[in-house]
Amino acid sequence: MRRAALVALLALGGAALSGAAAQTAPPETRGPVRCVLPVVETRAAAPGAGRRARGAPCDPAERGAAFEVTYMGFSAEAQAAFQAAVDTWSCLVRSDQTVRIAAEWTGLSATTLGSAGPRLVRNADGLPARDVWYPAALADQLAGRDLEPKAPDVEASFNSDFPAWHVGLGPTPPDQFDLYTVVLHEIAHGLGFVGGLSVEDGVGVVGRDDLRGPFAYDLHAEDAFGTPLLDTRAYPAPSARLAAALTSSVWFSGRAVRRVRNAPVALYAPARWLPGGSYSHLDDVAFEPGSRDGLMSPFVARGEAVDRPGDVTCAVLADVGWTLAGACRAAVGDLAPERGGVEVVQTGPNPFRSRTSLRVVSAAPGLARAVLVDVRGRRVADLGTTAVLPERPFEVVVEAAGLATGVYVVDLRVGAGRVAVPLTVVR
């Protein structure tokens, strides 16, 4: 009975607090945020890794998304390899909005094969979570319109000066780097296989490249004990504690990933933070070079060739928010739409003398923030911020220490919604 009464109370409290939030503002756009693929000579491809067949990935009529590429400086052969990778991705994700890529074939550092990444959007109508950055191509799909018509969704650069490219689509020689495979890797970053947590001067922060706030990818990141890296009670941001987590053991634990692996998957987290490499890739030990999921490890070896992304890569993009098509859909399946909003259950006493607690369950991935305010709306205490998933509740604890007798309100923002829970402190 207490649960039913509380849910009804939340509906009333939420209405009282949601007036300002209901006013729509223009979406924020930033970017691009790039991941860099370096030249690494110590990585060895598995035997036969260069011999994968790379035929037409699907019938053109069966493609799930239209991609439009603006090519700058490409030779005919390099452009053909790039376009083949684009065509593969067009068979694996579904969108009714055109995905636009700006691709440059240009001189880069001798130690760089290429880089790419998405422009980012947050707080647009139609996006599932508030204050979370989404890759522009996905944001367009979720919003049902092009949110930034004058800008590409993905920006990419590849090293035209590098002397050891394999630009054909046949078997990759053992002494060359396969351009098709490198482009396939970088487009995955552009579609959202990229995180927004980073280490700066030994301190972990929620943000990167002068951009603050979490990415959709970050909602699914946790430590070895299952604690979300966005949980500010465990990992304040900025903090050395968050930096230690990002450079030790990080796992991706989305619903789709658990479906295909029955467990979280390890992300690349070397002891020394590697900008553009750490955290935004699969672990290079857990996933063998030359395998389909090895595609999204942080390095590509000479002679390594991959025909398409693997099941884990597909699942990560599904958890970020993509609807899958073709071989990705066949591997991961369809994720049922997450509906039902937010449910809050009082798990501690109310009124209370020393402490009480709430259990928050969200039907969709998002950020949860809880603040305690007094009856005049003045902030009394920050109760924490964390990532919430359908299978990962948010426990809110309120301590009475330092509070006078009276009525207080837990102002709870989850995703794009906002609810309020009145609490009474008695002495």
Predicted segments with their positions:
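Extracellular zinc-dependent metalloprotease catalytic-domain scaffold
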Residues: 23-184, 189-328
